[in-house]
Amino acid sequence: MKFVLLFGVLLVTLFSYSSAEMLDDFDQADEDELLSLIEKEEARKDCIPKHHECTSNKHGCCGGHLFKYKCQCTTVVTQSGEETERCFCGTPPHHKAAELVVGFGKKIFG
């Protein structure tokens, strides 16, 4: 009887220790996921929206519906005759075509 009681106490101790370790692992994973989401949200706040100027930060455009916007540049001639480069965040034509196809696919199949 003493052996069964001792074995039961040992089993309960091991079970509680292992479950505490698992809970710590889950808590750590939750914290890591939360920090990752916060970092993504911060990056999203700092991004440049569609149709806004991205001349100084060409890789900082926000994400669109399916794809990230791309910084598209054009050369502009000022009134004084100087050529300057002006850039804006927008959707490239091949991304627009892909979004159109996906939209039709959703309407037909979805």
From Swiss-Prot:
Q: Which PROSITE patterns match?
A: SPIDER_CSTX
- Tissue expression notes: Expressed by the venom gland.
Annotated signal peptide = 1-20
Principal cellular location given in the protein's record: secreted
What keywords tag this UniProt record?
Disulfide bond, Knottin, Secreted, Signal, Toxin
Q: Which residues form the propeptide?
A: 21-44
UniProt GO molecular function: toxin activity
| Domain of life from the UniProt record | Eukaryota
Q: Which GO terms describe its cellular component?
A: extracellular region
Cite a single Pfam family from the UniProt record: Toxin_35
Location of the protein in the cell? Secreted
**GTP-binding is among the record's keywords:** no
Give each disulfide bond as a residue pair: 47-62, 54-71, 61-89, 73-87
Q: Does the keyword Lipid metabolism apply?
A: no
Annotated domain remarks = The presence of a 'disulfide through disulfide knot' structurally defines this protein as a knottin.
Please give the family membership noted in the entry.
Belongs to the neurotoxin 19 (CSTX) family. 03 subfamily.
Protein name (record): U1-lycotoxin-Ls1aa
